[in-house]
Every structure is written in C-alpha cells, then in structure tokens.
Amino acid sequence: MTDPGYVEFPGSPFQLFQPYAPAGDQPAAIEGLVQGVADGLMYQTLLGVTGSGKTFTMANVIARLGRPALVLAPNKTLAAQLYAEMRDFFPKNAVEYFVSYYDYYQPEAYVPTRDLFIEKDSSVNEHIEQMRLSATKSLLERRDTIIVGTVSCIYGIGNPGDYHAMVLILRAGDRISRREVLARLVAMQYTRNDADFTRGAFRVRGETIDIFPAESPELALRLTLFDDEVETLELFDPLTGKVRQKLPRFTVYPGSHYVTPRETVLRAIETIREELRERLSTFTNEGKLLEAQRIEQRTRFDLEMLQELGFCKGIENYSRHLSGAAPGEPPPTLIDYLPADALMFIDESHVTVGQLGGMYRGDRARKETLVQYGFRLPSALDNRPLRLEEFEARMRQCVFVSATPADYERQHADNVVEQVVRPTGLVDPEVEVRPAHTQVDDLLGEIRHRVARQERVLVTTLTKRMSEDLTDFLAEHGVRVRYLHSDIDTVERVEIIRDLRLGVFDVLVGINLLREGLDIPEVSLVAILDADKEGFLRSERSLIQTIGRAARNLHGHAILYADRITDSMRRAMDETSRRRSKQLQHNADHGITARGVNKAVRELIDGVMAPATTHDALEDAVPLAALTDEKAMAREIKRLEKLMMDHARNLEFEQAAAARDALTALKNRLLLDGVR
C-alpha cells in the first residue's frame, strides 16, 4: 500500500513523493528520456528552460527506471540545492551528498624562482566526510540510491575492492574474540578512545564494545560479547545512551575511503623503495645532488612511517603503489563504486563538462614541478583527477541537463529532449534593447517602478569597478542595494540571495554570479549593462542564462543596454523569442492562465540536517551573524561541544539536546563552504 502523495513504478525500488502530476513539457520530456535509456542511448540532452521543473523531471526518470543515479552539479551551492530537492522527492530512499570535504585546502607546491616550498595544509569538514562515507555505503548496500555531487567525484578516493574487503560483518551468535574485533577496528582506521566517543572511534568496557560508525550521523553500535560469541547488537544514542533498536546483523564500514590491508602496505613499501632507487640514480647521473638528497630524505621518512603505522602524511602520493596500478593508470574514484547500470545526470552541463576537462591539467602542472625538483617521486603524478577521456570511458548512460547546451553536448547527444513549456504557464521574459549611453539613469527609473510593486531587480555589469560605482550611485539615490562579488564566501552569498527574496533589499548588482541555478521568483527585471561588449560574460549562453533569471516572475522583463546588436545578442534574443512563442501558443491552445511562483524562503541546505531550533538554555551562544571567520566558528563549535558533553555528564539531557541543535545550526552554516 503506497502512502498518499507517493508514486511507485513496477520493478523500481524508489518511492517518488509527487505532490503534483507532471505538466507542461514535463510528461513528454520524461517519456522521451526514459525511452532513450531503454533504447540504450549513451548520451541524451534535456534542454530545459529556467523554471520548467528540470529536477522534477530528473526525479521522475530515476523513479521510473529504478536504477541508482549520480547527479553532478558545477558547485557546492547548486549541489546543496539539488540535494535538498531530491530529499523532498525521495524521503524514503537513500539520497546522499558527495562533495569535497575540505573547508580549506592549500595543496603542496614548489616555486622554483623563489626556492619556496609550500607544505600541504587543509581543514576537513567532518560532517561532509561523514556524508561521503554514507554515500559509498549506500551504493554498496542498496539499489535505491541517488548521489548528488560535484567534480570532487573524479578525484581518487581509494580502491573499492580494498574498501569492501575491509568491512566487518557482525551477526548475533557469531564466534569472534574481543581481541579480533579490536584488531579489525584498528585496521579499519578506527581509533580507541574511552573518554571522547566520537564518529570513527570505539570504546571498550569489559565484554562490551561501543563503535561509532564513521558514516553514521547520530547513532552508534553496542556490541556485547559472551565467551567469544556475539550476544547482542544494539543501536543507541551516544549522547543519552538510550537504546534505539536491537539488530540481528550489522556491517561496520571502514573509517576512511583510504583503508589498505597490511599486506598491501608491505608490498607497496617494496615497490616504493625500487622507484626511489631508480630516481636517485637518475638525479645522480644528471648531477642533481640536492634533488637526490631531498627525495631520499623525504621518501625514507615516509617509508618508515608506513612500516610502523601503516600510513604517513601525504600517503595519497603513493596511491599507485598501494592500489597496484600500472604507471599512468587512472586512480579509483566514486564512479568506480557505481553499478554498471547506474544513470548519470550532469546538471548545468555547459559549465560542469568544462570543469571535468580542466581539473587534470592544473593538477598536473603543479605536480610536475614537485617531481622535477625532488619533492615527490614520479608516481605522485598518478594521484590525480581523471582526464575527460577517462571520465568518458567510465560514464554510465548519461543525460546532460542545461538551458544552454554547449558544443560538447550538441556533438555527443543522441537524443535532445526539449522542456520549454513551464507547468505554471509562465513564459520567457520580454527582451528589450535600449541605448547604453543613458543606461544608468534609465535603470534607476526602471528600478523605482519595480520597487513600487514590491518586486526585485538583478543588474549585471562587466567589471568589479563598475559594480561598485553603480552600487554607490543607486544607494545615494535611496535604493536598497547590495553588491555580490567573488570575495564573498559561499554561505554569505546564500544569505544575500535569501535577504533579496525576503525584501531586506531590492536590487542586487553582480558580474558573473547571476547565472546558473539562482531560483529567485521575486525578480521581475534583469538589466544587462554594456550588452554589446562581446566576450565570455556577454556570449549567447551567458545572455540566455542571465535573461532566464526573470523567467520565474509573472511580470518578467529583460533589458539589454547596448548601442549596437551583436551576433551573440541576436542569437540570444532569437532563442528567447522562439521559446516565448512556443510557450504562449501552448497556453492559448490549452486555455492556461500563467500564474506566479510562490516558493517558500528557506535555508538552502534544508534537509541536510534537522532544522535549527532556538532554546533558552543557550542564551550565551554567539549569534550566527557575528561569526564572520573560520577561527570564530571553530571556537564556538568547541564551546558548544563542551557545553553539550557537560550537560550530558550531569544528566541534563534537555540542555544537552539544545546545545546539540545549536551545534547543528553552526555546522550547517559551515557545510557549503569549501574549495572544490
């Protein structure tokens, strides 16, 4: 019996929450993509305009085909938005989030001109690390899995064979000694800590072993042994100690994607020594004695650490030896964890495909310098992201999703499905060209008209200087305006967009930050200054994407300020006009009256964790707005963690839960912030 609002399809493990039936072009798009996959097409393109419900279409295709899926987005902000939406559509299935877990990342580098070596430095976001581990666990355990990720998925994460071979399967009644369980946990990179019980740790009290799985957000496992036999397995809350569920069986997954069996490490040590001998011989023959001394000293230290501890700092640079791969072979990535029949969706593909192709070259240039000057062995070059052709060789059946497909999608797609008609009946905005020499004064007048109707305005300029000057000019004339620029971090950017929707201010000025995936139904006017200056920011695709920001409003309008009409402008205006004509015709044929979008304003990462709540018990907490840098946030996180544990020790569980919720809110704020 399916719950109300849920839809199931024959042979599919997914339960799709569908509060409304597909409408507009959605039914035809869903049918076309499903048929294309069934026909064995490798590449398809969903050409979906802004606001046409592309995510809903993707969700329907996944649910109907019943296969695991990987959805790639060009950045963490859009990945979080997609993740939240997919969680809404599939609340009963495994929707996972796989992005870079670095809050801060400074790669190892050498600058020969200054003889400057820069050590690797990074800060790992534990919450995202837990979500990455949860993603691979779901792929190995269940078919109803959807992973939402970024280009982080083409970076090496450890061999899936080694990872799967290291799991610890526990069943009630199994014969296993306490010593064997502890040895297996240590080999899986869990740490024993009887005092501070956190994710990736275990503690021992007599015959009872508590394990906090690395991929679990909130529940731990209690294993009770009697006479070298598993007596009970229980899931419990680590904070309160309350038992939630008794289990007949539990699988403990490794504490890291990079776990390696001991025999593999010993084998790798021998091959690293062999490569070191070859490299020393090369440097000596070339008279590079400094480089020879440098590589010998660094590598021998790493070998000693591997021998004694099983890992070393920068172990990823020896990944080729640990995986047993041949020189030049690509590293194992998340894509190797996907089943052969999985689906792939590349959202905003005109941007994402370019990123997939560009990651390898930048990484290679930096590492070649390290190898040349004796900081790393040549095998370090194989610790790298996939090249585009390697990614293509590993791709599953794929759908490119974009309002403006690029040349790559056009050349590869066997089937192009258009989704131009919106379910709401909204049509693409009218596009108007006005003279550039009076653009600022004209824009001010237009802004006042829109503000009087309580609507919002987006303005895009060509340079940072012009954005700043325009923002100052508008502010001097009484306009509530903000400026969005590249120095603003991800979380603050999300808050600015949220404030625009809430009406804290009316006009947002930016350069290249107003294009893909910004969902702002309140925006009725998009103004593009200097639209006739040909280049990346005024290309056909950029113009169509920017014009599309006004397509979610009933009174959507776009003004291009230009003294001449360029080829890019002409093509963008023709395409917008074609779509608008098709939409108006569809509305007329079906008697549809366009209606505006009323979308609740919510935190972008809603659904990643429970919504934050306020509690009187935390009156001393620092307001989120006051935490402007990483150090302040780190201090507040430590303070809240200590407060939570103090309350728990004193059996003040309500206050402990309040501190935990405040901690969750703060970690949510940090969640989107990262490098890749």
Curated annotation (Swiss-Prot):
One of its GO terms (molecular function) is ATP hydrolysis activity. ATP binds at G48, V49, T50, G51, S52, G53, K54, T55. Residues 439-605 form the Helicase C-terminal domain. A motif (Beta-hairpin) lies at residues 101-124. SMART domains: DEXDc, HELICc. It is found in: Cytoplasm. Keywords: ATP-binding, Cytoplasm, DNA damage, DNA excision, DNA repair, Excision nuclease, Helicase, Hydrolase, Nucleotide-binding, SOS response. Pfam families: Helicase_C (PF00271), ResIII (PF04851), UVR (PF02151), UvrB (PF12344), UvrB_inter (PF17757). GO terms for biological process: nucleotide-excision repair; SOS response. Residues 35-192 form the Helicase ATP-binding domain. The UvrABC repair system catalyzes the recognition and processing of DNA lesions. A damage recognition complex composed of 2 UvrA and 2 UvrB subunits scans DNA for abnormalities. Upon binding of the UvrA(2)B(2) complex to a putative damaged site, the DNA wraps around one UvrB monomer. DNA wrap is dependent on ATP binding by UvrB and probably causes local melting of the DNA helix, facilitating insertion of UvrB beta-hairpin between the DNA strands. Then UvrB probes one DNA strand for the presence of a lesion. The beta-hairpin motif is involved in DNA binding. Belongs to the UvrB family. This is UvrABC system protein B. It comes from Bordetella avium (strain 197N). The lineage of its organism: Bacteria, Pseudomonadati, Pseudomonadota, Betaproteobacteria, Burkholderiales.
